[in-house]
Amino acid sequence: MPEQLSLRDQLHVRLQEKLRRELGAAVLDALADPRVIEVMLNPDGRLWIDELGVGMRDTGSRISAAQAENLLGTVAATLGYVITPERPVLEGELNLDGSRVCGLLPPVVLAPAFCIRKAAALVYGLDDYVRDGILDGVVLPTLASIDPAPTCGHAAILRHAIRTRQNILVVGGTQSGKTTLANGLLHELTTSVGSTQRVLTIEETRELRCTVPNHVALRTTETVDMTRLVRTALRLRPDRIIVGEVRGAEALAMLKSWNTGHPGGIATVHANDARAGLIRLEQLVQEANVPPQPALIAEAVDLIVVIVRTPTGRKITEIARVHGASASGYVLEPIDPTIVEQTPQMHRHLIAL
């Protein structure tokens, strides 16, 4: 160990080396593979991966209970935490690459288990979503002579929403790609506003990838929750407030911030369709010990984007505008993907036809 390293740095290096040994070749290879999304160890010792274009599969590799327990202990040590049978749940980030890790020990499982969700190595932009058929956005023949050729449909609607500072709620089920889509919207935000706006991101685990130059990333701790961070963000002179996954009482603070001079936000929520996403927000708002607040929700949320996971991949199936709330429920306008978002350049071209 080089003498110039402090004792703390030496400990960090040793923990990193120990972590790599205990992860083993199979896990390290999976983490290095850009096609792999998640790496999972079941209590029976089988190692599974979720791979783009393939789905879930057994790697054929096995990890013993003793090795898995040692691994989780080392991960906990890198996080300044201890995982024991009395504290059998570990959640945090793998400090090798920022991947999210959740580990379990008996008695909550029969034998040690974990799931590692890899940090996004690349950010998919909206053009990538269109190219892969996840997002509707085709070039109309009458507009093909414009350079660059504009797209119509949902892609154009999302770009317009980003430019005009609409609040966007990304809705989807487990593993539907909500965070990846939020990162795609953040990428579009970077290309649209550059350094002209200050963006604050708030999340429990660092998964959002924001490349806006004027950006502050906030993350919860055991003593600072999401609600506290949203309120703190308001004192940091934000132009836009982006919330990773809304899962609790922070929904109320977020909606109020979007509604009081900080439009252009993005957030994700777990639900199966646009209307269910708003109802889910109602449920989360009530965790702040207030009534459901449908009027506030309808005023704060401008656009809902629904992404689903299908047997063949991800697909954005629905985009809807929120026009208000009534006694019978929310007033939503599903957006037809054949609609063209007319930029001034497109408008001049169409007039000339």
Where are these regions (language model features)?
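P-loop NTP-binding catalytic core
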Residues: 56-73, 77-164
